[in-house]
């Protein structure tokens, strides 16, 4: 980890953050709910990324330790926060299991129709040495398809097969083995940052 909370805030990667109200991008920052169009902050290539300029990664959650191995965080996102409609109460529960796995569970309640897509930006350096990168880590992803993006990193709506592409991690493959290849999706995503 980093030495201070200020070091985390300075990172552009949402390092370790809970992401919301809406993880990923909303095209042109526009949503329509019940016939009403809402304009959200356009904080990333003209799109709304991770809930806007002041998404959940910039909010202070209330912490409740439920047991030695369980921490629950809660937050009330008020109606209109970052342009989103409805009061949204969300909870994130972090549990450390007996076999040393981290289990993250999300729940949310709202008082009106809205959008919500919570996620987490945890990153792990399994070497324990922050000066080393992860390019030699073997990665397996049990997925036959991915969602391509355009040059503004917005998903195109296509669901593309991974077979015969640099996105194919169905067999253990070093993360860095193909990351510098001339595959347009690696250029658009600045590496592997796709669904």
In which residue ranges do the predicted regions lie?
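An exposed, glycine/acidic-rich loop-and-rim segment of catalytic or binding clefts
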Residues: 1-195
